[in-house]
A protein has these predicted regions:
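A short, glycine/Asx- and small/polar-enriched loop/turn
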Residues: 113-117, 189-191, 427-428
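Short, acidic/hydrophobic/Gly-rich beta-strand patch recurrent on exposed beta strands
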Residues: 6-11, 135-138, 321
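Extended interfacial segments that mediate partner engagement and assembly in macromolecular machines
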Residues: 48-60, 66-177
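Terminal RNA-binding accessory module
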Residues: 1-60, 64, 332-335, 341
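Rossmann-like S-adenosyl-L-methionine
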Residues: 200-439
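Short, solvent-exposed loop/turn elements at beta->coil junctions and helix N-caps
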Residues: 105-112, 180-185, 227-232, 418-423
């Protein structure tokens, strides 16, 4: 999954030996390799020569592939990447959750290049590499990749990487600028790019003038972060319209560079559409959206349901969700609560009332407490459980764990599951699953 071929060494007697992970090798290939780490039960190695290439091998278009840690699978045909991710999902469901989906959904996929609308790039002056570097970390390293372009960033962002290096190198505080975050908003027709610069010392007036000139030249918006996340502010221009659109539902979603939003806007639109179709919301339904964030799912659901309750652990995101609901004229059909869903209990869920449908979209840690609370409710108050749950996941292992609880303890059936290729050319596996309450 991380661009490594997996095999077994043979013992002297011909029996299967320890596992070997070969970076740069693909399934079915015959390669010459060199081990760089040996453990009692496994080895790690790199490819020296490909003797018999896989028919699925392609030439990576990025000159930094293999060094840069931003991508791991550019050498594998995109369709095969999705197939491998699907297999990872199914294997996790089987071996971790002890469950299997009745139906495997058609995968969600889209553009494989220029899709990364959010990114955090490190900044460092490295004299041995010619000066200022701006880029992703090298693979399994704290070093920064010496990169002048990036295939997965939007072309307009990729084009400014070298000028950005030159800009930072010209600042009086160039050694006190550790990172820049990229956030691109996308409406129906236009894009807006914001760069959030982390500064550990104040800018001089000359520095500020340089940032403004860069913004005018590249048509970007500067945000600055002098200390913690709470100190982030729009520097230039001060009025910024940063948003993404969900046109199918007539939703316009404003956000800040520090807000969590999906990296891939095109895939997010498809994901929201499919999730709502799978949720099968009726006009009379009361729906819960757990880990709701800015309201990415909450607001589209509100266009279909009678009422939606969004629950989020971040106070800042809860406030932003309230603002977004009001801006889209949906504040009368939505309600938001700030709760720690990693410690939620059956009593907490019971206090929220009965929901006909539930959408769960947790971070990588998953929704174990929510799943356990639903399992506890099923023992004595099964009538309070939602008939259908749609679970959107960014970690197949925690989805599998929670699926095991929902199926084996809470009385649900895993009806469908499939992958969402939110991060092409990487090992990240996003997925979606549908659970129906058994009668």
């Amino acid at each position: 999954m991380e661009g490594r071929g997996v095999g077994h060494l043979r013992n002297e007697d011909g029996s299967q030996g320890k596992v070997i992970f070969v970076e740069g090798a693909l399934p079915g290939e015959r390669v010459t390799y060199k081990s760089f780490r040996r453990k009692p039960k496994w080895e790690a190695a790199t490819v020296v020569e490909i003797q018999r290439p896989s028919s699925l091998r392609v030439t990576p278009p990025c000159p930094y592939f293999g060094t840069c840690g931003g991508c791991a699978m550019q050498h594998l045909e995109p369709g095969a990447q999705v197939a491998i991710k699907q297999r990872v999902l199914e294997d996790n469901l089987k071996h971790i959750g002890r469950v299997s989906a009745e139906t495997i959904m058609r995968p969600i996929y889209g553009p494989t290049w220029g899709y990364r609308y959010r990114a955090r790039l490190s900044i460092r002056h490295v004299a041995k590499k010619g000066g200022m570097l701006v880029g992703f970390h090298e693979r399994k390293s704290g070093f920064i990749t010496d990169m002048a372009s990036c295939k997965v960033l939007p072309p307009e962002v990729s084009a400014m990487l070298l000028p950005l290096r030159q800009l930072v190198a010209s600042l009086s505080i160039m050694d006190r600028v550790p990172q820049v975050e990229v956030a691109v908003g996308q409406g129906d027709q236009e894009k807006t790019t914001a760069l959030l610069l982390r500064i550990m010392e104040p800018l001089t007036e000359e520095d500020k003038a340089k940032l403004k000139a860069f913004a005018d030249r590249w048509r970007i918006h500067w945000w600055l972060q002098p200390k913690g996340p709470e100190t982030v502010y729009a520097f230039y221009p001060e009025t910024i319209d940063l948003h993404y659109a969900l046109p199918e539902f007539g939703i316009r979603m404003p956000f800040k560079p520090t807000d969590f939003t999906q990296v891939n806007h095109e895939i997010n639109r498809t994901l929201v559409s499919r999730a709502l179709r799978l949720l099968d919301v009726q006009k009379t339904d009361r729906v819960a959206d757990l880990f709701c964030g800015l309201g990415n799912f909450t607001l589209p659901i509100a266009t279909l349901a009678k009422h939606v309750v969004g629950i989020e652990g971040s106070t800042a995101l809860t406030e932003r969700a309230l603002q977004n609901a009001a801006e889209n004229g949906l504040d009368g059909k939505t309600q938001f609560h700030c709760r720690n869903l990693f410690e939620v209990t059956a009593d907490d869920l019971l206090a929220l009332g009965k929901f006909d449908r539930m959408l769960i979209d947790p971070p990588r840690d998953g929704a174990m407490a929510v799943s356990q609370a639903l399992a506890e409710l099923s023992k004595e108050r099964g009538d309070m459980l939602p008939q259908r749950i749609v679970y959107v996941s960014c970690s197949p292992s925690t989805l599998a764990r929670d699926a095991g609880i929902l199926v084996n303890e809470a009385g649900y059936a895993l009806k469908q599951a499939g992958v969402v290729n939110m991060f092409p050319h990487t090992a990240h596996v996003e997925s979606i699953a549908v659970f129906d309450r058994l009668a």
